């Protein structure tokens, strides 16, 4: 469900509080109807920052997640993020997918190519920000490094063939989407399986981040009593350590272009 009509060109033209209330009620009504009839359907909202409206409501994944959290029937409402739509707002598409996964709301995806903050280009997947496309595929195919929810849905491409293409070119551009995805998937699997990658992720504390703040059964009082967390914490030693972020990223790029 793409709310491309819902928005404004002029801030004076809408009671924004009322607009969000009606938007929420409309979604809840449709979601409630689906559930009341026992239909095996879910609603996937597709955020977009602008075009055709000057400012579209729910412009990003984060905005949509906030509204979904207010719904009475939000269990059947999730997200269908599009690569270009997040990148039109200057945002990281892979992060958007990750947050939707983390919230249990990644129902579908629309993959395509976008070259920066401009109109919605809908180019073939990977024909925009190639590095971002690589990490998107890495997440979709390999999951989070420390484990967690996985996307099990279709790999869907929402792109437009160039207006300069004839019928043969239209089909070639369709194949380009799938070819790019499969090539990136192979490279992403090789990247994750590489022992150097795993060593660098360890040094970068990627795996450590997967550890919860409190251990199983640990209480806030236990945490406060742990002197290693504050009183005996060696800030100088922590500050002097190397994280190898650039080396890890460069290693990913070697896999991508090697």
Indicate residue ranges for each PLM-predicted region:
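Gly/Pro-rich active-site loop or hairpin
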Residues: 11-20, 54-65, 75-78, 85-152, ...
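C-terminal extensions of enzymes
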Residues: 165-258
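Acidic carboxylate-rich catalytic motifs and surrounding loops in phosphoryl-/glycosyl-chemistry enzymes
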Residues: 46, 155-159, 194-200
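Active-site acidic/histidine proton-transfer and metal-coordination neighborhood
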Residues: 1-78, 208-213, 234-236, 241-251, ...
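Conserved beta-strand positions
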Residues: 1, 45, 81-83, 111, ...
């Amino acid at each position: 469900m793409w709310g491309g009509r819902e928005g404004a060109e002029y801030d004076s033209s809408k009671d924004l509080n009322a607009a969000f209330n009606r938007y929420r009620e409309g979604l809840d009504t449709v979601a409630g109807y689906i559930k009341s009839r026992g239909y095996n359907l879910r609603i996937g909202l597709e955020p977009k920052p602008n075009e055709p409206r000057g400012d579209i409501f729910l412009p990003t994944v984060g905005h949509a997640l906030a509204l979904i959290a207010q719904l009475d029937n939000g269990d059947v409402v999730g997200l269908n993020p599009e690569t270009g739509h997040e990148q039109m707002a200057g945002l990281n598409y892979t992060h958007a997918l990750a947050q939707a996964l983390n919230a249990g709301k990644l129902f579908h995806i629309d993959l395509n190519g976008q070259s920066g903050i401009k109109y919605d280009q809908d180019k073939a997947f990977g024909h925009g920000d190639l590095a971002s496309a690589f990490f998107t595929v890495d997440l979709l195919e390999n999951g989070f490094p420390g484990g967690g929810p996985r996307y099990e849905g279709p790999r869907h491409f929402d792109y437009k063939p160039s207006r300069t293409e004839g019928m043969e070119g239209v089909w070639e551009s369709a194949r380009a989407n799938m070819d790019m995805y499969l090539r990136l998937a192979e490279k992403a699997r090789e990247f994750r399986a590489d022992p150097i990658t795993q060593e660098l992720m360890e040094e970068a504390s990627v795996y450590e981040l997967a550890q919860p703040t409190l251990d199983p059964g640990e209480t806030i009082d236990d945490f406060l009593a742990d002197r290693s967390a504050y009183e005996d914490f060696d800030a100088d030693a922590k500050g002097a350590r190397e994280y190898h972020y650039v080396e890890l990223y460069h290693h990913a790029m070697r896999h991508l272009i090697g």
